[in-house]
């Protein structure tokens, strides 16, 4: 059995208060997540996790969809408290009755405790039953006035640590406009205005990762000026993206074919950012022209 501590978060609370958004937020923070786990299965699940040697951060949604919820949850929590390898925190999500009714009307779903179809009656019944669990919770969040993004931010602030900062990472990529914009790009920059190495016969078959092409692109005055502006724009906004709870920021730099100018710029940007941020560099279309030639 592993002697590593498992950081366990049980996400619970009122139906409709935002547990789906919450569990997605924990996944973005690097937690192993399970939605709608029956309380009776929790001890066995945790035993299996303890046998592994991996770092454990686990978030489980346990709520009213589990039919025997109230009969089992107290004994399960007692079992967890007795395990020295488990650090338990309970996140309880709440909202006003009127807000929950509004959300149910919007989604046209039925409340799990509304046997007669009256949502408000189900909400009141659930709220009454959850009073003991709410009193045991270390974190109670009222989501009445929170957007999904704001809820993600609250969870990130309360449950991330310095070691979790790696959960925010940067993707720097190059691409060719002729092959289409990257669908997942957050920031797109166009460097097609720069001198094109393609028209230099000696450089045509090389890429922006080759020193000769890199030097050709970067030694032009307009290239250096634009790059300095680009870096000056990006560096100050990265902490703001992280603060907002974004898990991946994709910065895409494009030229015509994605082989020369954009590759050189993306590579330089990645080199300058990687010392301070978790980063992955990729070049979507760097071999696209060669593949096209080979097929023809």
Curated annotation (Swiss-Prot):
SUPFAM superfamilies found in the cross-reference section: P-loop containing nucleoside triphosphate hydrolases
> GO MF annotations for this entry?
ATP binding; GTP binding
Record-annotated residues binding ATP? 13-20
Residues annotated as binding GTP are: 63-66
Q: Which branch of life, at top level?
A: Bacteria
Asked whether the UniProt record includes Calcium among its keywords, one would answer no
Q: Which InterPro entries match?
A: P-loop_NTPase, RapZ-like, RapZ-like_N, RapZ_C
| Keywords for this protein | ATP-binding, GTP-binding, Nucleotide-binding
Which HAMAP family does the entry mention? RapZ_like
Role summary: Displays ATPase and GTPase activities.
By sequence similarity, the record places it as follows: Belongs to the RapZ-like family.
Indicate what this protein is called per its UniProt record.
Nucleotide-binding protein Sez_0730
What species was this sequence derived from? Streptococcus equi subsp. zooepidemicus (strain MGCS10565)
């Amino acid at each position: 059995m592993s002697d590593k501590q498992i950081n366990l978060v049980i996400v619970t609370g009122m139906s409709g208060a935002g547990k789906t958004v919450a569990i997605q937020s924990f996944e973005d923070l690097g937690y192993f997540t399970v939605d709608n786990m029956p309380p009776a299965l929790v001890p066995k699940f945790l035993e299996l996790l303890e046998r592994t040697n991996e770092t454990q951060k686990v978030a489980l949604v346990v709520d009213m969809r589990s039919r025997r919820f109230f009969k089992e949850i107290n004994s399960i929590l007692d079992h967890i408290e007795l395990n020295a390898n488990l650090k338990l925190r309970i996140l309880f999500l709440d909202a006003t009755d009127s807000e929950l009714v509004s959300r149910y009307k919007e989604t046209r779903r039925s409340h799990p405790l509304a046997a007669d179809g009256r949502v408000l009656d189900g909400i009141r019944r659930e709220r009454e039953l959850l009073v003991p669990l709410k009193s045991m919770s270390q974190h109670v969040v009222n989501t009445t006035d929170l957007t999904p993004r704001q809820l993600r931010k609250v969870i990130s602030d309360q449950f991330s640590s310095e070691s979790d900062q790696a959960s925010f990472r940067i993707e720097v990529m190059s691409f060719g406009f002729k092959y289409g914009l990257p669908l997942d790009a957050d920031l797109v920059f166009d460097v097609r205005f720069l001198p094109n190495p393609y028209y230099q016969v000696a450089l045509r078959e090389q890429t922006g990762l080759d020193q000769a092409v890199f030097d050709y692109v970067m030694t032009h005055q307009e290239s250096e000026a634009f790059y300095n502006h680009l870096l000056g724009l990006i560096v100050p906004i990265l902490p703001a993206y992280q603060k907002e709870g974004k898990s991946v920021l994709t910065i895409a730099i494009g030229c015509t074919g994605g082989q020369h100018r954009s590759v050189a710029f993306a590579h330089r940007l990645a080199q300058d950012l990687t010392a301070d941020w978790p980063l992955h560099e990729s070049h979507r279309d760097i071999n696209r022209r060669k593949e096209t030639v080979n097929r023809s």
